[in-house]
Amino acid sequence: DYPRPQLARPSLDHPTWMSLNGLWQYAATEGQATPTFGKSLNDQVLVPYPIESVLSGVQKHSDFMVYRRLVDVPASFTAQGKHVRLNFGAVAQDATVYVNGKEVAKHIGGYTSFSADITQALRPKGSQEIIVAVHAPVDGVNVMVGKQRLKPDGIFYTAASGIWQSVWLEPVPAASFAQLEFTPASSLDAFTVTSKLQGSSGNATLHVTAYADGKPVGEVSGAAGAPLRLAIKQPHLWSPQDPFLYTFKATLAQGEQRDEVTSYAGLRTIGIAKVGGLNRVVLNGKPTFLLGTLDQGYWPDGIYTAPTDEALKFDIQKTKDLGFNTIRKHIKVEPARWYYWADRIGLMVWQDMPSLPNGHNEKLSDADKAGFRKDVTAIVEQLKGETAIIGWIPFNEGWGQWSIPAAAELADQIKKLDPSRLVNARSGANCCDTKGDPKAGDLIDVHDYQGPGLPAPDATRASMDGEHGGLTLGVADHIWPNTAINPYGSVKDNAALNDGYVANTAVLRDKGPGIGVSGSVYTQITDVEGEHNGLYTYDRKVEKVDEGRVRAINEETIRAGGPR
């Protein structure tokens, strides 16, 4: 399946793209140097799985590595003046890309996508050599690493280095789409269409048609790159109960050349409003309790990369089946297809920023802080077209938060980039490396194990429980080997886990509405390595809870926190 359904150049009739996932030549190297060209490498790696994973075939970390692949580019990709674009979903941490010995791209940041026009580097015929040189530091560096560690322990897990998302080629016109965003109007009857372009795009025009169930419901034309208002007839709103998505067909025209893509988006708003005198989160103008699970995006065989698209979808679907309406995507950014499934299945998403290493707050240089700010901007810009994402979380428990004002600064930075969503300036205001309240952002957020936390809103912010629960139950024969178990909140058996979950969530149902709590996040949807506090085992083979009981209490809690 096409790796980026939010900007799909291929149609069912014209699948004009070429996957480069599969076996690549591979070599770990001693340091960062220009690779040798035209020479085979001794080992192999299965892309797009990080080198530490079983599926990669390597199962060993290296700070430096080189990937090599020979590719026959179809003649149709360069016919009629087309250009060839090479796309990478993500490479951890820094990547330099060469085609036939010519450097075509350099990218810093392990959680964001990048691409390169490689047309001028292609040979007239025969195989094309693609080489990717990667620097993947994990420990001892102040960059976004999330929970990756070279020595996993407790709440920190195996590293995920190298190419860990899809790689593909596609033919494009000289002027082409790089990104399309559809931002719902506050009036909920239109989208603002924003296009980002690549190549020579002077005097290019954009035409977009919106479809609902295959029928056109709006269209707009104008200058490419400028924001355009696309009015929608008889608006159909997106919500977890009804995750309706509009389909869009967009054409970028410049002279005789056309770039045609399909996209999609849901029509919804998210914000804070006074409800009964208290600040509450409102979805489409209505108070909504955001009942979520913590989702860390780890798999035993692929680490950061799901083994299949079905596996990627599984956690989202099961979260929905259990009666939750929200996911907190914890300290990780997922491939575009993950958000596609969240959009379609209907779950709201709190999107964390992958953290800098914890415990290093006093050691961060000005360059470290600037690098984090730059990465935050890149992640927001990449993901702000995703319907499911309703809010951003720049800091978790103070990890990498170098000062109290830093949370306010990042919250303001994100709000300027994306005023259409909520910003939770720091999750876990009462915990760990957090030093104090910056009095910024849209929410007050506390962590309380086992909890739940019941913080009250204040004069400017709504409130939520950002993490609670963590009831721990290991299941024999489904436990990650050779990792110390993090045993907080242990229960003796499945019955105790079920009873504990129901009792815990009932507190939110019974006390949350009166206090004005707008949401909660239960830790967590699956076990992860040494953490056995999932509702599913790490291998996803055992559901530890009674789905019917969990769904019933969850639905009651969402109703209690909704419109009166």
Would you name each region that the model predicts?
Residues 326-554:
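Substrate-binding/catalytic cleft of secreted carbohydrate-active enzymes
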Residues 24, 101, 167, 246, ...:
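Conserved, mostly hydrophobic/aromatic
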Residues 1-58, 133, 137-142, 163, ...:
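Accessory carbohydrate-binding/adhesion or oligomerization-edge regions at the termini
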Residues 10-11, 25-31, 57, 62-176, ...:
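Accessory beta-strand-rich segments of carbohydrate-active enzymes
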Residues 104-105, 217, 288:
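Short hydrophobic beta-strand segments in globular cytosolic domains
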Residues 99, 190-222, 228, 248:
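Beta-strand-rich binding/interaction modules
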Residues 171-201, 280, 557-564:
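Surface beta-strand/loop "capping" patches
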Residues 180-182, 249-319, 556, 563:
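N-terminal carbohydrate-binding accessory modules
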